């Protein structure tokens, strides 16, 4: 009887490990590049979303001294 409990425990552990590994195969977030200009402090309020995207079109998420902000592509 104890053998079956051990077998069940090992099988359950194996399933949990595989689920953890497969979960890491999801799409990785894009790497954020440094902004091409040093923006003034007033742009520091325009933050990127948690998935490193910008809400407004024609804006790009980049990192600066004040964190990840959205800058106009123009």
Swiss-Prot record:
One of the GO biological process terms: antibacterial humoral response
Keywords (A to Z) from UniProt: Secreted, Signal
GO MF: serine-type endopeptidase inhibitor activity
Cellular-component GO terms for this entry: extracellular space
Protein localization: Secreted
Position of the signal peptide: 1-19
Keyword rRNA-binding among record annotations: no
Protein name stated in the entry: Protein WFDC9
Natural source organism: Rattus norvegicus
Phylogenetic lineage: Eukaryota, Metazoa, Chordata, Craniata, Vertebrata
Annotated gene: Wfdc9
